[in-house]
Amino acid sequence: MRCLLCQCGEKMSGFTTITEGEYFEETEKRSRFISYSFPVNSEIEAMKFLKQIKTKYPDARHHVYGYVINGFSEKYSDDGEPSGTGGLPIINAIKSMNLSNVLVVVVRYFGGILLGTGGLRKMYGSGALNVLNLSKKVKLTLCIRMCVNVDYHNYSKILSMLSKNGAKIISTDYLGDIKLELLVRKESSNDVIKKFSDILKNNECVQILSNEYCVV
């Protein structure tokens, strides 16, 4: 199970992202366009990957990029290309696929023939779409990580309740009472907590650990 600790102030109920980076290259009028995709969770992480690409292609004329994080935080750069011809088409490509927490960098080696603003928009947008189409995607859902101590008498009832509510048990400790650590979808977490209280006759039996985006 893949999980991502939620550190954003405004939380989405879920989003689709990519699981790993991909590569795509195409040529237009002797200009090389080399596209990379990366899963990122912060601006710091995005800038780290951008630096790696600049180091890998130090002699390229342009390192154009765009990223979307947490569904609403976005940034892009044309890196010397005419305004709006590079970074914005990349952002639009990411948004058109309803992706978040994604960085796309498109490196251009100029081939000596001007492409015009329309040609540049086309190539940067195409590079982003193609590399994102190659990237494996995953749906992440906002979950609550919690732990609870369960007595052996009620253990089977708790397991049945968790199964019906789609909760995922992460770990089980059988020392003393049974200690469960689990992930519950945010949308059903209040109901699960109430059922814990009803079954265990304890209104303070659940400890909330964190909010996380997970594959459930």
Language model segments and positions:
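Terminal alpha-helical anchor/extension segments at protein ends
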Residues: G127-L132, C147, L200-V216
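C-terminal regulatory domains involved in ligand/effector binding and gene-expression control
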Residues: R2-G84, S171, S189, C205-V216
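Hydrophobic side chains in well-ordered alpha-helices
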Residues: A46-F49, I158-M161, V192-K195
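N-terminal positively charged helical leader segments and presequences
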Residues: G176-D177
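Active-site beta-strand/loop microenvironment that shapes enzyme catalytic pockets
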Residues: G86-L134
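Terminal, non-globular segments
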Residues: L182-D191
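Short amphipathic alpha-helix segments
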Residues: N149-A167
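Short glycine-/aliphatic-rich beta-strand segments at the starts of folded cytosolic domains
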Residues: K136-Y152
